[in-house]
Amino acid sequence: MARDFSLDRTRNIGIMAHIDAGKTTTTERILYYTGRIHKIGETHEGASQMDWMEQEQDRGITITSAATTAEWDNHRVNIIDTPGHVDFTVEVERSLRVLDGAVTVLDAQSGVEPQTETVWRQATTYGVPRIVFVNKMDKLGANFEYSVSTIHDRLQANAQPIQLPIGAEDEFEAIIDLVEMTCFKYTNDLGTEIEEIEIPEDHKERAEEARAALVEAVAETDDELMEKYLGDEEISIPELKAAIRKATTDVEFYPVLVGTAFKNKGVQLMLNAVIDYLPSPLDVKPIIGHRADNPDEEVIAKADDNAEFAALAFKVMTDPYVGKLTFFRVYSGTLSSGSYVKNSTKNKRERVGRLLQMHANSRQELNTVYSGDIAAAVGLKDTGTGDTLCGEKNDIILESMDFPEPVIHLSVEPKSKADQDKMTTALVKLQEEDPTFHAHTDDETGQVIIGGMGELHLDILVDRMKKEFNVECNVGAPMVSYRETFKSSAEVQGKFARQSGGRGQYGDVKIEFSPNETGGGFEFENAIVGGVVPREYIPSVEAGLKDSMENGVLAGYPLIDVKARLFDGSYHDVDSSEMAFKVAASLALKEAAKKCDPVILEPMMKVTIEMPEEYMGDIMGDVTSRRGRVDGMEPRGNAQVVNAYVPLSEMFGYATSLRSNTQGRGTYTMYFDHYAEVPKSIAEDIIKKNSGNKAE
């Protein structure tokens, strides 16, 4: 079966934004206008098409990125709706990895908000071209110029409007198109009746100034256009469009559009911009992977149906009707249902049962998927997030995704024996779906400990265990994931010698331990000269250190950011073994704990609090009392914004405290930023508490 849409007529886009900027509503409207749904679902009524998990409809926020296919102007648009809440940044990362372009939605009253900065940063990391949609122009306090200024100030982005609004709040009635210098007026509530009119006389001067600024900004990225611009030559509409498209796909320029998705204005024009300015799979750089058996040999996955099949699995979900669904993006080649593929990441052969194209939570069966497509497969048993799927003869591994370690943990206990088995199943499935969710059994207490990216993240996962898997469980108090590190250097010896009849055990190492830079992780250097420690025992020394570091040296937390240089040692011809050198390495680490000034580190959260000015004093005092460090303040509209770094351990239950301090008028967001040293008195408490737990 031939493909319905050629590659140049395919767009893979994400909708990304801060929580409550109107992202899901915007996606809804796209689906409405592209004929995918017949009645518009409102997020605040809990009836939105994209938010199909029960928890999402209850909370009115988007948690999982549902992939949806729509058609517009003879193009296929695959849309991934991404969550805007910081606890779900991993979902955003996953989506961005497989997109070719994105629409960043801003709230016209607030402009760029903290989570916008986070997702913008992630999109920049992955080199994703973006257009910006300033939404909610009908909202009280909507200010288009202010929103655009925040893009420049907070994101340092080369962005210029390609549209201007006429009016704001209740008066928002039309949109000026600065590329074609025309105006679109809306004559009905559903936004289906649009009248193209001339730019009103009293807005002409403003439009001409804005167009000149647009041409200048785009000309800076295009030498030919710059020559014309400087020579005062006429720049035609096709020339300007082509230059905007090139600058946008090269991630050098960001067109800014305007509208209100809720009141159905500006969405069709935004869809036109997606087609006009965002790249097709042919416009983006080919994805570079490497050979499975040789990580140094690069392999290119070219967007071509005739090439070898290569795809990246970016999401795993459990569907109540068809079981495990694996969402994947095809980078090259084609795939038919019923065929076999190779999971080159795990070196496993898998059979693709059925291929589905998803629309929020309804589905359409496909026989074949082509390069550039986003689809879901049923029947892949061993494939997880970030795995590469390829043809059986192909041997490519696409660059995978790195997921952050959890910063918060809870204990969960099943209420009954029946819940115990169900909980095990639930935890396995939830970990398959979400790589930032970890679960393990504590060896000492026997408790099941779950870890995630924040309180809301774990709340929702516990909620899903109850609703989807019928697991009743008791949840313990949140626990912080502390870490340990060394502050100074020392040379130490670890010697393990045991003789108890027959063959003995002998291993002897001398290691220099020193602090590594923050985020540098563990670095092991083999500086042995002359074979004083035979080569076959070196990996055992490194393994022994890694194992011991997992349990720390002070309070049982993993030891991080440490360098270890093995420079001397000795061995015995008969008695030395891998095990003996492993033990010797762990003894060296114990010795280092006495000399290297070990400290406990705690996760520091970047917290942004927004509230009316009159509560500023109370909030600042509260932040300080939580051992927070204020990093700056700025006015935002008629509110004040405080940026601070606060230890995670001090942020539990902060939502309640903020509510009472601001009479419900304050909001905050936080995400993990870095690890920092714990004050001595608190470190002593942590050590005491942990040694008490071990004694029990």
Swiss-Prot record:
Single Gene Ontology MF annotation: translation elongation factor activity
Subcellular location: Cytoplasm
CDD domains assigned: EF-G (cd01886), EFG_III (cd16262), EFG_mtEFG1_IV (cd01434), EFG_mtEFG_C (cd03713), EFG_mtEFG_II (cd04088)
SMART domains: EFG_C, EFG_IV
Binding site for GTP: 17-24, 81-85, 135-138
GO cellular component terms given for this protein: cytoplasm
Keywords, ordered alphabetically: Cytoplasm, Elongation factor, GTP-binding, Nucleotide-binding, Protein biosynthesis
Family that this chain belongs to: Belongs to the TRAFAC class translation factor GTPase superfamily. Classic translation factor GTPase family. EF-G/EF-2 subfamily.
Record's function text: Catalyzes the GTP-dependent ribosomal translocation step during translation elongation. During this step, the ribosome changes from the pre-translocational (PRE) to the post-translocational (POST) state as the newly formed A-site-bound peptidyl-tRNA and P-site-bound deacylated tRNA move to the P and E sites, respectively. Catalyzes the coordinated movement of the two tRNA molecules, the mRNA and conformational changes in the ribosome.
UniProt name for this protein: Elongation factor G
